[in-house]
A protein has these predicted regions:
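Acidic donor-binding loop of glycosyltransferase active sites
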Residues: 173-184, 197
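Nucleotide-activated donor-binding/catalytic signature segment of Leloir-type glycosyltransferases, i.e.
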Residues: 145-167
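Membrane-proximal helix-turn-helix segments that form the acceptor-binding/catalytic region
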Residues: 33, 46-68, 75
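Carbohydrate-associated surface elements
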Residues: 74, 93
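Charged catalytic cores and adjacent phosphate/nucleic-acid-binding surfaces used
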Residues: 259-299, 304, 317-357, 361, ...
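Active-site proximal beta-strand in glycosyltransferases
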Residues: 15-18, 23, 28-49, 69
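Conserved donor-binding/catalytic core segment of Leloir-type glycosyltransferases
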Residues: 102-130, 136
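A charged, aromatic-enriched C-terminal amphipathic alpha-helix characteristic of glycosyltransferases
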Residues: 221-258
Length: 493
């Protein structure tokens, strides 16, 4: 089943995949974590949020879901605590035309659930005391038990099947009162309200309080009708039409964040230019954790055949300026950049910068500072969960401001981190970048992009449309050991 679902999702070319109740092991969870389409998750119950159990898996799930919805404020609050994010409350949905009010009988409809046996017995006692009333016990699932009905009440107490909407509508349209079972189906109570029944909730209440409330409503027609009118008004706001409109708004909003589909084939605006290999992420000795000089870096890049490099030191810009100056008489393209540490949302690289950007600003402020210089926003290693990264809310909120997403970083410990970035870039049709994140010469070029030669930021973005990601990984342990040795030597000096 799982394999068939994954195959269908891969071949379907869907714009949006919408899963319901993914907080339990289900095909919805599989679909949302497998597809490359835009994803929406709807939570229907605060009691169905236990999966996945580990924080790491919940974070991965959250990163793959683009919009979180809930059908009640209670469920939204519980899901937000579990999955960390803003949830939109949408209607549960009810067919107001099918579940429309009709002529009422003196009948109490009670949801029949194992957890509600006490409610069933209590309502049976009330019907016995009020001879003009009938009781209908409605089951929407196969019965695992059968309540005992006293012989003297069998003309007024009936068990009714409510497996289909039509069956439930017939029962609820005639009922004057509906009593929900503790932990029962929220939709059934909504259908009862739409059908004009006065609804009595039992969840979290003492049985004697419920019995007292129902007893009062049986003898007070005006109170019962007022309760029914209030419920009907609420049910009309929860219609399927309203739900469809809200979901359409969510889908359109998500689709609006995605870049326009680029044409394939011969669409190469820089087709007359030569191909070069460009490493878009590396460091010099201006970074606190690197001892490679800009001069050595340029010589090595030339020696291994790179056509371009981006100097992206940590929170400093001097190394990039030095490299640009040293490269003036070389054919090697040097992009001046900086890897800027935000306050608490990871790092953002600015490419084609003119001046240094201070660390410690918010993600939004950092992106704005890059934009003010006419720079390009390049997001490095966005899913490297072993380091500080943007949380899913920040990533989704600012996706339209990301010019290039790094889908391959040669220094990441796990391939899955790069795979996650590639999935995200494909979903939103972002331009893809790659870099070595080299801190030693031996790492330079282990991640790069094959692209057309460019001369300015605009041509750089045009060239990335037809670029190819190059993966040339070397042992991370080997590269890390070289970095540590170089740092120790620097300290000894």
């Amino acid at each position: 089943m799982r394999a068939n679902l994954k195959l269908a999702l891969a071949r379907g070319d869907f714009d949006v995949v919408h899963g319901f109740e993914p907080g339990v092991p289900s095909l919805s969870y599989v679909a949302l974590t497998t597809t490359d389409a835009l994803t929406v998750a709807t939570f229907l119950s605060a009691a169905r949020l236990g999966y996945p159990p580990s924080r790491a898996r919940r974070d991965r799930f959250r990163a793959r879901v683009d919009a979180l919805l809930a059908t009640s404020a209670e469920t939204a609050q519980a899901a937000a605590e579990r999955f960390r994010g803003d949830l939109t409350v949408v209607p549960l949905g009810v067919d107001n035309a099918l579940f429309r009010p009709a002529e009422k009988r003196r009948c109490i409809a009670v949801e029949l659930e194992p957890a509600g046996r006490g409610v069933t017995r209590s309502m049976t006692r009330l019907v016995e005391q009020n001879e003009q009333w009938e009781l209908e016990l409605v089951h929407t699932k196969p019965l695992g038990f059968r309540p005992s009905i006293p012989r003297r009440l069998r003309q007024r107490v009936h068990i009714r099947r409510g497996r289909t909407q039509a069956q439930r509508a017939e029962i609820l349209r005639a009922a004057s009162l509906f009593v929900a079972a503790p932990g029962g189906e929220e939709r059934l109570a909504l259908e009862a309200a739409s059908a004009g029944a006065a609804v009595v909730e039992t969840r979290g209440r003492r049985l004697r309080d419920v019995e007292s409330e129902v007893s009062g409503l049986l003898g007070d027609d005006a109170a019962r009708e007022a309760r029914a009118a209030e419920g009907l008004s609420h049910a009309q706001d929860e219609s399927f039409d309203r739900l469809a409109a809200d979901l359409d708004e969510v889908y359109v909003r998500l689709a609006g964040k995605r870049r326009a589909r680029r044409s394939s084939g011969s669409d190469d605006p820089l087709g007359g230019r030569d191909w070069i290999v460009v490493d878009l992420h590396m460091h010099t000795d201006w970074s606190h954790d690197c001892s490679t000089t800009a001069s050595d870096l340029l010589d090595h890049a030339d020696a291994i055949g790179l056509g371009g490099i981006a100097i992206t030191d940590h929170n400093v810009f001097g190394g990039a300026l030095e490299a640009v100056e040293l490269a003036r008489n070389r054919r090697l393209v040097v992009i001046p950049g900086e890897e800027v540490k935000t306050d608490d949302q990871g790092e953002v690289i600015g490419l084609f910068l003119r001046e240094e950007i201070p660390r410690g600003m918010s993600f939004s402020e950092t992106v704005g500072a890059i934009r003010e210089q006419g720079g390009i926003v390049y997001l490095p290693h966005p899913f490297d969960r072993l380091h500080a990264i943007p949380d899913p809310e920040t990533l989704h909120r600012h996706v339209h401001e990301i010019d290039v997403l790094e889908v391959f970083n040669a220094r990441l410990l796990r391939d899955s981190f790069n795979d996650e970035a590639l999935r995200f870039a494909r979903k939103y049709r972002l331009l893809q970048g790659a870099g070595s994140d080299a801190h030693v010469l031996q790492g330079v070029g282990t991640g790069a992009v094959r692209m057309r030669r460019f001369h300015d930021p605009e041509e750089f973005l045009l060239s990335l449309r037809t670029a190819e990601i190059l993966r040339r990984p070397k042992s991370l342990a080997y590269l890390q050991s070289l970095k540590w040795v170089a740092q120790v030597k620097e300290k000894v000096r």
